[in-house]
Amino acid sequence: MHGITYDPVHDEFTVPQQFGQAILTYRGGANGEERPIRIIQGPHTQLDAPEHLDVDVAHNEIFVPTRQGSILVFARDGQGDVAPIRVLGGPDTMLGGDEPLVVDPVNNLLIVGGTAGRGQRRLLIFNRTDSGNVKPKAVIGGPKSGLYSFGGPFAVYPPKGEIIVSVRGPGPYEELSSDDAFVGVWSIHDNGDVAPRFTIGGPKGVLKMPRGIALDVKNRNMMVSDKRLNAVLTFHFPELF
């Protein structure tokens, strides 16, 4: 389980269950051994060991990447063995495997991680409602981008069109800590081999293996969890907002 999304409108949180081939939704105040209030599970779902997801509260949809290189979209209130309401996938999409994703509900975009060979990664930007074998409208990646193995779920700040990504760093030991790990910020308008507009971490920085990212808009802070440090770090980041 490498993804968890909180829905403040309905006070629910949703998680993927890799071994149960399921998407589980709990009430926000769940405690102890409590049953989920909804379960998406079964052969019609096409779920295959899901690890990541994002919930678009504005449009009541759940986005789930698959290991086969597709994105399954479900109704937020889906229950049981339900088929996705649409599927994004095919060779033109450049999707490949279960990579992190995030929805920008304001700018109507879907940002998905993709592979680029030799350990490099890229960001694929689609229209939120894209379905079938559709080419991304923009692709960010290349040596200048510094995109290697992704650390965890992405984040977006729609008012400024920003994409926030945790990157583990290059090399064959991407599962281990890296002095090159960083959090980078790109624009939804970027395309091609574009360097991040802002970075935290990098060569000899404090981050070793960044994973999750959360934004505290009110106080202009960014919180980053780091698996190797076993810590959550809070950075004051007014430039982001």
Model regions and ranges:
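Beta-propeller fold detector
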Residues: 34-42, 82-90, 134-142, 193-201
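Short loop/turn segments immediately following the C-termini of beta-strands
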Residues: 18, 28, 66-68, 76, ...
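Short beta-strand elements that form the blades of beta-propeller/WD-repeat-like
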Residues: 14-15, 64, 164-165
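Structural motif
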Residues: 21-26, 70-74, 119-125, 172-184, ...
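Beta-rich, blade/repeat-based domains predominating
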Residues: 1-10, 43-61, 91-109, 113, ...
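Short loop/turn segments immediately following beta-strands, especially the blade-tip
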Residues: 25-33, 73-82, 125-134, 185-193, ...
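Blade-level signature of beta-propeller repeat domains, shared across WD40, Kelch, NHL, RCC1
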Residues: 209-241
